[in-house]
């Protein structure tokens, strides 16, 4: 019988097709494995990412875990059980009422709080100023422009004072000095809202004497305070005692209101900063984001006062300008103190990444994107 040779044209064609198929399978396998490697090496770990989406869903889940907030809430509940015994009797009822309301809002995470900040923050200020009680022109509107002035020593390297004072609302942090001849050309002279960490409030109020020395910018400047310790509702009651925030009418003799940030805003800020910190950890160490807690004191980790002030301003202003955020090797940590070292409980580098996104690509910020919060961020500019 005659032997069939493989040199026949049809056989050669079959062989070429077979080789092509093998190469195609090999190439697809390579692409799949290289894709896995790219995901593992991606800045935010790659896991849980949707096509065309910069947000890592696994990091979103991890950011929701907040032991520090849980510890504060548990301590608050114990204070309620003990009827806030540390409060002087004349301030106890007011302090307890504020604490109960605050605890009652703790259980719900709601990025939609951004759309309520005009009502929660600006409306009480308008009422105090006599602008928001009768359906006037200013009722319900946002501030046209806001300047948030941080405390970084880099402020002294520029002269932004006049630019800062040109904004409708000027927000300052933790009673940093302003307005005198030494700092005015750098930080401005006007203040429309003081943002205080409640630790600062606790240091300048004296409950036993019923005295409040926390109004560094004058009795007519409202205070917005974040409660980092539920016991500080006593100091809040003392400082808010003379304000007219509950009367609904302006009073020339009354001090401006002391407003407590809504716990939903606190939780939103905490998740945003932890997300950016987790992402930074995974990118810089190459380790799984789940190991983040080993490198940080998770029970102490917290966002900075400045970060929350910026987010709050984004909720009540049509345009936000930010000054004095950042660092330089030659500058002090705070422009008005000798402190040079940053606080370990904050991840400032992660916050700087958030600020860069806020300025240049706000759509990439988890929790604050319009589809998450129903809120559109205003333009935010950082002056350095």
Swiss-Prot record:
Residues 1-5 are cytoplasmic. Keywords: Glycoprotein, Glycosyltransferase, Golgi apparatus, Membrane, Signal-anchor, Transferase, Transmembrane, Transmembrane helix. It comes from the Eukaryota. Residues 27-384 are lumenal. Glycans are attached at residue 241. The chain crosses the membrane at residues 6-26. It is a single-pass type II membrane protein. It is found in: Golgi apparatus membrane. Possesses sialyltransferase-like activity in vitro. Transfers sialic acid to the glycoprotein asialofetuin. The transferred sialic acid is linked to galactose of Gal-beta-1,3-GalNAc through alpha-2,6-linkage. PANTHER family: BETA-1,6-GALACTOSYLTRANSFERASE GALT29A, SIALYLTRANSFERASE-LIKE PROTEIN 3. This is Sialyltransferase-like protein 3.
